[in-house]
Amino acid sequence: TPVNKIFVQDYRKKYGRYPTFYAAQSYDTIMLIDSAVRAVNGNLRDKDGMRTAMRRAAFPSVRGPFKYGNNHFPIQNFYLRKVVKDSEGNYTTNVVKTVYTNHQDTYAKDCKMSW
């Protein structure tokens, strides 16, 4: 995604290496929180508004389109990746193919949670 490309470029510039998946998840987390705070105009006492905004997940994810399933797990794509060396000799991964598109957790259908 374009957001992912910018994230990787900025991360490499600052840290001199490719970001880990944990770094991407952390970035998404803070972007989700930021989108919720903006949705309530900074009024953190508006807990219902914060919850609604967090559920909506209207933020630019580095993983592409992002939404939650009924069990509060992300619905997202999964990829088969191959470790390769880039033009500078650094190890990175390339996407070989999309394994699952908009995949929801296998047990979501059994989950009794609801919004």
Language model region names:
Residues T1-W115:
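Extracytosolic ligand-binding ectodomains
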